[in-house]
């Protein structure tokens, strides 16, 4: 289920698979696939992705986007990027791209409500 409200055209800093969490690239206007929970992620690649560096890529920046799940996820959990740009559950002290709209397991394509933020440390 998706409801993409805001898409931003960027250039790929490297190949980006479809439905992957992305972060800013090395230059303005470029995006690369997310690689860690500490990344400053800003959206999710669309169904086309990008096959090589400098290819155009549309990034879903607002609304509900389809995203590749990289672990077991329960709807409502905050999601962050694993090493492959797939969605995994964000824990204390990690950044997140948004919240799961549906439950799923690794290999599923789920949905994320895009609302970037940070999970505070316990007691913070």
Locate predicted features.
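Surface-exposed, low-hydrophobicity beta-strand/loop segments enriched in small/polar/acidic residues
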Residues: 1-124
């Amino acid at each position: 289920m998706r409801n993409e409200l805001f898409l931003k055209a960027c250039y790929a800093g490297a190949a980006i698979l479809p439905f992957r969490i992305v972060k800013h690239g090395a230059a303005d206007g470029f995006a690369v696939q997310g690689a860690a929970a500490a990344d400053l992620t800003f959206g999710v690649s669309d169904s086309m992705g990008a096959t090589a560096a400098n290819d155009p890529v549309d990034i879903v920046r607002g609304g509900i986007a389809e995203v590749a799940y990289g672990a077991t996820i329960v709807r409502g959990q905050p999601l962050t990027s694993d090493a492959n740009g797939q969605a995994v559950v964000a824990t204390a002290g990690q950044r997140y791209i948004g919240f799961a709209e549906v439950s799923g397991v690794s290999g599923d394509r789920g949905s994320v409500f895009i609302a970037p933020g940070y999970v505070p440390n316990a007691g913070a």
